[in-house]
Amino acid sequence: AGEPANNEDRFNY
């Protein structure tokens, strides 16, 4: 995903 709506796409803690 280039710019995911939710940050969970890039940083899933």
Curated annotation (Swiss-Prot):
Keywords in alphabetical order: Endoplasmic reticulum, Microsome
Cellular localization per UniProt: Microsome; Endoplasmic reticulum
- Keyword hit for Endoplasmic reticulum: yes
Give a yes or no for keyword Translocase in this entry.
no
Q: Which GO terms describe its cellular component?
A: endoplasmic reticulum; intracellular membrane-bounded organelle
The domain of life for this entry's organism is: Eukaryota
Q: What is its main location?
A: other
The entry's protein name is: 13 kDa protein
* Native source species: Triakis scyllium
